[in-house]
């Protein structure tokens, strides 16, 4: 089967300049690249054909031979190169331009590797969460070596660009029509060759260290909130900037209050006599004790809302919501029991004086009436 004309394959005129040829190749390679066509055999063959045409037409000497002799110029062992290397055509540059998100950008260059971010979990009390406080913490991290100041080299030692990756820290390889990029195996991504590594960090430029920090906890924080301490993470490689430290807040469970956002909830026990007659009770708040009036005929479960007595966060103050719990007296003596019996007798049949009982009895009557229908 006769080979197609290389200019025809790329869709350009014979007099096309280098820019037109490169532009045409990029457009077609993008269209038929195996990563996009996913196993389409016909597209793979077209991709090979496009590569072969471009390798010849992008090389001035090969193009001149092709223009004069056609495909015969590369027969009998004088082929276009079999795509084993980049040859005269800069495939690496083109694939880097087209698939930068896959291969990490265009032409390789030494990368500044920022330090790792660190996490520290801290537990605080509700009282500490409500008001701003300071906490001392210890973290194990990586810092720039004090001996070599992060260079990884002994004083006076030569630092040269890695001869393999030329300082990029990464190398590209072409296999068939695939271009891959990986960490340089000789410099391990540093992009440099050190004549005499630092005796303290052994050429790493970083050492492990325990650091003491003081963290300011802002008022109103809650469990799950994170505080970001910029530049307090691990030191970067090759003198690069440090990462950040994230302090994650955990607020301990409180023995009185439960929290929901900026609101606080608590139960307030009162006697059944106070519930019936009314009175005054002391309620705990974050600012101390507060006397609150209990209205007469208060039922269990009633909520008292104390506005602005909750948690203040970002300028907004929540409420303290108190649920009334009526306590039943225990260990009564005979005199007390007799008084309660007399009270019960005095209320017999007077359901209006027992609203819960009235509602319950009405509901029971309706239930049985419906069953009998």
UniProtKB/Swiss-Prot annotation:
Keywords: Chaperone, Cytoplasm, DNA replication, Metal-binding, Repeat, Stress response, Zinc, Zinc-finger. Residues 5-70 form the J domain. CXXCXGXG motif repeats lie at residues 145-152, 162-169, 184-191, 198-205. GO terms for molecular function: ATP binding; heat shock protein binding; unfolded protein binding; zinc ion binding. SUPFAM superfamilies: Chaperone J-domain, DnaJ/Hsp40 cysteine-rich domain, HSP40/DnaJ peptide-binding domain. GO terms for biological process: chaperone cofactor-dependent protein refolding; DNA replication; protein refolding; response to heat. Gene3D superfamilies: DnaJ domain, Heat shock protein DnaJ, cysteine-rich domain, Urease metallochaperone UreE, N-terminal domain. Zn(2+) 1 binds at residues 145, 148, 198, 201. GO terms for cellular component: cytoplasm. A zinc finger (CR-type) spans 132-210. Its cofactor is Zn(2+). Belongs to the DnaJ family. PANTHER family: CHAPERONE PROTEIN DNAJ (PTHR43096:SF48), DNAJ HOMOLOG 1, MITOCHONDRIAL-RELATED (PTHR43096). NCBIfam families: DnaJ_bact, PRK10767.1. Homodimer. This is Chaperone protein DnaJ. The gene is dnaJ.
């Amino acid at each position: 089967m006769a080979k197609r004309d290389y200019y025809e394959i790329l869709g350009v005129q014979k007099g096309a300049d280098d820019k037109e040829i490169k532009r045409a190749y990029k457009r077609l390679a993008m269209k038929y690249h195996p990563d996009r066509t996913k196993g389409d055999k016909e597209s793979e063959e077209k991709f090979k054909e496009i590569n072969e045409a471009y390798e010849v037409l992008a090389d001035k000497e090969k193009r001149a031979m092709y223009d004069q002799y056609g495909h015969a110029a590369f027969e009998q062992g004088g082929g276009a190169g079999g795509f084993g290397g980049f040859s005269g055509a800069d495939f690496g540059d083109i694939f880097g331009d087209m698939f930068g998100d896959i291969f990490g950008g265009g032409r390789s260059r030494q990368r500044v590797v920022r330090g790792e971010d660190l996490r520290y979990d801290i537990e605080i009390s509700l009282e500490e969460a409500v008001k701003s406080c300071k906490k001392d913490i210890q973290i194990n991290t990586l810092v720039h070596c004090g001996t070599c100041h992060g260079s990884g080299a002994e004083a006076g030692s030569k630092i040269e660009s890695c001869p393999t990756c030329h300082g990029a820290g990464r190398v590209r390889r072409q296999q068939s029509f695939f271009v891959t990029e990986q960490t340089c195996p000789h410099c391990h991504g540093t992009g440099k060759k050190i004549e005499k590594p630092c005796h303290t960090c052994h050429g790493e430029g970083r050492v492990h260290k325990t650091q003491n920090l003081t963290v300011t906890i802002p008022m109103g924080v809650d469990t799950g909130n994170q505080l970001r301490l910029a530049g307090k993470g691990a030191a970067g490689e090759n003198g690069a900037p440090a990462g950040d430290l994230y302090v994650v807040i955990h607020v301990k469970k409180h023995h009185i209050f439960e929290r929901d956002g900026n609101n606080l909830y608590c139960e307030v026990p009162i006697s059944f006599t106070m519930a019936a007659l009314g009175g005054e009770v002391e309620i705990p708040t974050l600012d101390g004790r507060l006397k609150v009036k209990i209205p007469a005929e208060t039922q269990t479960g009633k909520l008292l809302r104390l506005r602005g007595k909750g948690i203040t966060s970002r300028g907004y103050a929540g409420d303290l919501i108190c649920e009334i719990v009526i306590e039943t007296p225990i260990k009564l003596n005979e005199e007390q029991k007799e008084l309660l019996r007399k009270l019960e007798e005095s209320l017999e049949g007077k359901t209006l004086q027992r609203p819960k009982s009235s509602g319950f009895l009405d509901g029971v009557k309706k239930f049985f009436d419906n069953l009998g229908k």
